[in-house]
């Protein structure tokens, strides 16, 4: 029997949620009730699979903690009042910390004036953010298209490249093994994990995947395309593969890819959705090699952990394909005033506080210590690697990685695996993480590995 709509039920549910939003604290009974509600609603109305995925943060069989609020720039508090050091960073969105006061203030001030744009009048913050990004980004990047997520920024980049190269008879994209560019149909065509791709096959035609970091394979793909008349329109890659397991290419790889693109007349699209905004010790990871892309994709941390926003920034030559008809690719909420306010404030904080340099310094210290732990526990840890505050610990197998995440959770440190490489646990904290909290994270990691070693020896 079909369920009939219920306005009364919807009204009661929304009123209950609004009451929760107004609360700053919960008593014990309210906490227990909220936990039960959230788990039940995820199971019945969101996706029960998410509950099983969160096995690593299971406490007492309840599938996981229910977050309540930010504890500080670098911590989260759950409904039970437990405070966690955030070493996951929302998969890289909290570069300037949780509820950074500068970002929150900018959004609140804009909210008091005009939350969303009219679509007809010119909105000043979109113009100012585009100008700011033109000044901030490397090379000749000049024009920005704004959207709401990293996947959308990649979609826009692919469409820009197609619109630019199709009249030139170039239709094929090169992506790389281990890549993650999102899960919408176009972005998924560039993503390289079969688990995400196979249910939606066939994907968009015209994508080739070559081994990441192998410039000879990239060169061969260009040469074969030239010989067969299937010339390459663009290369899309991450300077460091995030979801692939924080995979760093050999030094000079990006430079050589840039040379191939120039030689064969292809565009270079860099997906810095996760590596951008200071994460790796530079504002953009491509700056480590002084490489200048034709199209740059940003999102995640661009909104300061307060508002969702993505950006696709391109050179004037490439972006000009949209000049005659700016409605070829648009989005209703992209570049809205609240999101732009958050992005402008985020950039201001990153520059004023020199957070990219802090990421480099603290990241080097953390990584050295993680590598020492890897040497101490070679039967558990394969390798520790990373750049800046984008780090990973790769374990010997998936189960060992899951166990580490669970042990860290017990010690109130949030970590998680990477989407394309489950045995690799990412360490991706806010760039604002204090020295004291860095030391606590290292202490927790050492305790976690020691506990895991005892379990291994007891078997």
From Swiss-Prot:
Q: Name one Pfam family in it.
A: Aminotran_3
The cross-references to Gene3D superfamilies, in alphabetical order and at most eight, read: Aspartate Aminotransferase, domain 1 (3.90.1150.10), Type I PLP-dependent aspartate aminotransferase-like (Major domain) (3.40.640.10)
Could you tell me the gene encoding this protein?
patA
Which reaction is recorded as catalysed by this protein?
an alkane-alpha,omega-diamine + 2-oxoglutarate = an omega-aminoaldehyde + L-glutamate; putrescine + 2-oxoglutarate = 1-pyrroline + L-glutamate + H2O; cadaverine + 2-oxoglutarate = 5-aminopentanal + L-glutamate
InterPro entries assigned to the protein according to its UniProt record, in alphabetical order: Aminotrans_3, Aminotrans_3_PPA_site, Class-III_PLP-dep_AT, Putrescine_aminotransferase, PyrdxlP-dep_Trfase, PyrdxlP-dep_Trfase_major, PyrdxlP-dep_Trfase_small
Source taxon at top rank: Bacteria
Enzyme class name = transferase
The organism named in the record is Salmonella paratyphi A (strain AKU_12601)
Molecular function GO labels: diamine transaminase activity; identical protein binding; putrescine--2-oxoglutarate transaminase activity; pyridoxal phosphate binding
Q: Which HAMAP family match?
A: Putres_aminotrans_3 (MF_01276)
User: Any idea which positions bind pyridoxal 5'-phosphate?
Assistant: 150-151, 274, 332
Please state what the protein is called: Putrescine aminotransferase
Q: Which family does it belong to?
A: Belongs to the class-III pyridoxal-phosphate-dependent aminotransferase family. Putrescine aminotransferase subfamily.
Protein EC: 2.6.1.82, 2.6.1.29
* Keyword Ribonucleoprotein applies: no
Per the record, the pathway is: Amine and polyamine degradation; putrescine degradation; 4-aminobutanal from putrescine (transaminase route): step 1/1
User: What keywords tag this UniProt record?
Assistant: Aminotransferase, Pyridoxal phosphate, Transferase
Function (record text): Catalyzes the aminotransferase reaction from putrescine to 2-oxoglutarate, leading to glutamate and 4-aminobutanal, which spontaneously cyclizes to form 1-pyrroline. This is the first step in one of two pathways for putrescine degradation, where putrescine is converted into 4-aminobutanoate (gamma-aminobutyrate or GABA) via 4-aminobutanal. Also functions as a cadaverine transaminase in a a L-lysine degradation pathway to succinate that proceeds via cadaverine, glutarate and L-2-hydroxyglutarate.
Which of the residues bear the PTM N6-(pyridoxal phosphate)lysine?
300
Q: Which cofactor does it need?
A: pyridoxal 5'-phosphate
One GO term (biological process): L-lysine catabolic process
